[in-house]
Amino acid sequence: MIRRTIPQKTISNEVELNGVGLHSGQKVNIKFKPAPVDTGLVFIREDLSEDNMINANIKYISNTDRGTNIDNGIVRIQTSEHVLAALVGLGIDNCFISLNGPEVPIMDGSSKDFIQVLEKAEIKEQGILREEFFPDSPITFKDEESGGEISLVPYENYSIDTTVDYGTKVLGTQKAYIDDISEFKEEISIARTFSFLHELEMLLDNGLIKGGDLNNAIVYVDKPLDDSNMEKLKKAFN
């Protein structure tokens, strides 16, 4: 079922941030620009001369291992999850997101900096109502390999409830929920990227987290390290 009850929103002014890509380690500039109604959230790769745009659409998701990557066969965007969470969390429907590289900057590992700069851009309502999907019956998807499961059920209000368990005593079972998207800024946006210590060697060996450090991620120590591995990590993270 599609409902139209809330006006679409965009930003009033262009704003920007500078940072580094978590996995590429490359310096990157990101700009947020106002967009007309029914545009959606659109990434623009300034470093590509033509055919440089891609919509933030589920059909373009190419990989979700250590980040949400989208790819339309021409344009690729890596680690899009934090910036998209900020835009959705603030109720922004239409925005051009311009990058001078393939990866969104990691900032401090959360959505906080994106929230702050988007609020400075002054969010405004537009003249057309937003289309919102409401399920008529429960929808469930389960990934048999990972065990992850997501369910969407009919409900008159907004509610998200999540549980994660990585099978480690260091972290344990984690639960979180919000009953209104307006809670995103205070309750969710400051949540930061994390990793377990045992994963770092594998990530480095696969050419990832080149821009990672303790300023943009939390590392849970879940195993002892010998001297050689400790030196390897020290060298990687300066």
Q: PLM ranges: what are they?
A:
Residues 1-238:
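Short acidic-hydrophobic catalytic motif
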